[in-house]
């Protein structure tokens, strides 16, 4: 019985968790799951995402609200705008999860009605894209999306079982007309390919799920084996990866370490072609080169023996402000905050705090803060002037951060580079 299956899944994965949000489309899968969850006496809310892609979208939202009202389950409606640049399916999925991320609470888990047949489709779509073992792992019963957890308790339940239960219970649900459009890849598999395959091999979906699980286990093992080395080379707080030793690694190891680092930094996974471009243009670049590559919403940049993952960095306007003892100064464009404590300077940025002790002669002295300096500069306490570029290099400030790094001056002498 489906209810028994569901209870077993909850006891196994979330024995103490009580707060859940159901992604409710109004289709047969999520309607069945809604009724099942209502019997478990959980702290449950349901969210319906209004994509605005169908003329029936308003009716679907109203239907979901009525069902939830009847079951006394709090209902949330979220309207989204779908970015179609990456395709309607991908755009709708991204908009859906972003909207859910806006309403889900830290103590809640998202529950979705993905089932065994969905798993087969996901696996075959990954196969079509040429995915490796991570992609071929398809979906897991418990997954993550940015800041929340996703639970798929019906992943081992077939569509036929769900349909049978819905008919037995005389549920009503909505039919999305786009599900019959085989122009979409997933629908093509569902409507044209899998019915023929299942006629030939009755347990095809179960075997695909088994293969996906094998891939997931291999991926977990790979991550476990590389965990220590990743920890050695990666600084996740700074989104930085030391690649000095990478040329002596095999290509496969280079690829996996870069993939794992990018994933843990929250970046979109590169394609195989992009990954090869990253390796060729960064790992094997001359040490004096500073290549940079666009990766979705991020930039991948190399400086000396490190890779850095950054967002789009805007160049701030010219900045020059005095900093007196016992005074604070907020820098523009999120660059941070400075405090002059008399005997030291505190530089605070993104939760990280550095304390720079002033020379005795400069205790309580008025200072000056700049974000850039051209030409030569005299370091405080040293007789010779030298190029500012050399001072940046000595302080290991990457090229793209040099106009976003505070410089502390006493008159025309450089006291600190705050990096």
Swiss-Prot record:
UniProt cross-references to Pfam families, sorted A to Z: ATP_bind_3, TilS, TilS_C
GO molecular function, one term: tRNA(Ile)-lysidine synthase activity
Residues reported to bind ATP: 25-30
Biological processes annotated in GO: tRNA modification
Subcellular location, record wording: Cytoplasm
E.C. numbers: 6.3.4.19
Enzyme class: ligase
Family: Belongs to the tRNA(Ile)-lysidine synthase family.
Record function comment: Ligates lysine onto the cytidine present at position 34 of the AUA codon-specific tRNA(Ile) that contains the anticodon CAU, in an ATP-dependent manner. Cytidine is converted to lysidine, thus changing the amino acid specificity of the tRNA from methionine to isoleucine.
Protein name: tRNA(Ile)-lysidine synthase
Species of the source: Actinobacillus pleuropneumoniae serotype 5b (strain L20)
Gene designation: tilS
